[in-house]
């Protein structure tokens, strides 16, 4: 039986989130055993924020949730790919469809931002 290896990175594994239809990589985040278990049980993506040191469900603030369609692990069982149906226009907190909108071009990083929502409106605090 395959067991996910959370030991290599201090209890965390990278999770590559991919659109289940197009194959586009939407985001990469980290999971621990608890968030992987929640994701597999709920069918929604859950992550561990290293910055905020807390658990969070994708879309809990924005409403842009992700419905899990398929979960795969790599040959070392230390990374997962989660294929999702993206509910709402964007996966990235910047309002972009994908977090990967900055491209290396002509020796520099070039932003190809096309926000689908205004993060200042969606993530109002207070």
From Swiss-Prot:
Q: Which GO terms describe its biological process?
A: L-histidine biosynthetic process
Tell me where it resides: Cytoplasm
Q: What is its EC number?
A: 3.5.4.19
Which amino acids does the record list as binding Zn(2+)? 75, 92, 99
Family matches, as Gene3D superfamilies? Phosphoribosyl-AMP cyclohydrolase
Q: Which GO terms describe its cellular component?
A: cytoplasm
UniProt cofactor note: Binds 1 Mg(2+) ion per subunit.
Which chain positions lie within coiled-coil regions?
Answer: none
Q: Has the keyword Zinc been applied to this entry?
A: yes
Functional description taken from the UniProt entry: Catalyzes the hydrolysis of the adenine ring of phosphoribosyl-AMP.
Per UniProt, subunit arrangement is: Homodimer.
Concerning its family, UniProt says:
Belongs to the PRA-CH family.
Provide the protein name. Answer: Phosphoribosyl-AMP cyclohydrolase
Q: Which organism is it from?
A: Geotalea daltonii (strain DSM 22248 / JCM 15807 / FRC-32)
Question: From which lineage does this chain's organism come?
Answer: Bacteria, Pseudomonadati, Thermodesulfobacteriota, Desulfuromonadia, Geobacterales
Gene field: hisI
